[in-house]
Design a protein with these regions (language model features):
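Short, charged/polar "capping" segments at the starts of alpha-helices
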Residues: 29-32, 55-62, 99-100, 144-148, ...
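A nucleotide-sugar donor-handling region in carbohydrate enzymes
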Residues: 1-4, 132-195
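Active-site donor-nucleotide binding/catalytic segment of nucleotide-sugar enzymes
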Residues: 9, 14-29, 120-122, 175-195
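Hydrophobic/aromatic beta-strand patches that form the interior of the parallel beta-sheet core
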Residues: 49, 91, 112-113, 135-137, ...
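Extended catalytic core of nucleotide-activated donor transferases of GT-like folds
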Residues: 34, 58-129
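N-terminal pre-catalytic "stem/leader" segment of glycosyltransferase-like enzymes
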Residues: 1-85
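Structural motif
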Residues: 19, 23-28, 51-55, 88-89, 92-95, 110, 115, 135, ...
Length: 195
């Protein structure tokens, strides 16, 4: 029932709330997407619709006038949601879009992959794990170099690659520096490990 209700709720979301959609497989993804949402909501004053498959994701109760959250648990309705999704931009930390059960929408959507792993794109993941994305927010130049090489080798269309960094790691490093300077009480919640 929860999946159907979530799917139905998303279908009722107004178009201006579907300009930027962020999909999270679990609440643990928040470590990687929080900084992006903060910039979108606070700095750029952009509405964000957050879709999670985690029924216990604390962001389902987050209150902000530019943030809305919907839960669509894994299963038939999540697959249907991905297949028929209407959105301008969808940001995910989930690799293998279009390779496994979750496919790109039949509607025009710009898909952005937000890396959560620091490692190589071809040493651990499937060779085509990132092929379905239109843009990728890369951790650093190594991702850009590897993805460009794959585009060249596979005669793929050139995608938008950005050296975005790794907000979770940067937050932890910032917290460590603050701790060393005796400022541990000034660290943000983003730097606090989950309990």
């Amino acid at each position: 029932l929860q999946a159907w209700l979530g799917w139905r709720s998303y279908r009722k979301v107004a178009a201006d709330w579907r300009k930027i959609v962020i999909y999270s497989e679990s609440g643990q993804d928040w470590h990687y997407i929080e900084a992006l949402i903060e910039v979108l909501n606070h700095d750029l004053q952009q509405k964000v619709t957050y879709v999670t498959s985690d029924q216990n994701d604390p962001r389902l109760s987050r209150r902000h006038h530019l943030f809305g959250a919907i839960c669509i648990p894994e299963g038939f309705f999540l697959t249907l949601h991905f297949n028929m999704q209407k959105a301008d931009v969808v940001v995910l930390t989930m690799m293998d879009l279009d390779n496994l059960q979750l496919k790109k929408s039949i509607n025009p959507v710009h898909y952005i992959y937000l890396f959560h792993a620091l490692g190589s794109t071809h040493m651990v993941d499937h060779a085509n794990s990132y092929d379905a994305y239109d843009s990728l927010f890369c951790v650093g130049p190594h991702h850009v170099e590897e993805l460009r090489k794959r585009e060249s080798m596979q005669a793929m269309q050139t995608r938008n690659l950005f050296e975005y960094g790794h907000p979770r790691l940067e937050s932890l490093l910032s917290a460590a520096r603050a701790y060393e300077q005796g400022l541990e009480h000034e660290t943000s919640d983003a730097a606090t490990p989950p309990v």
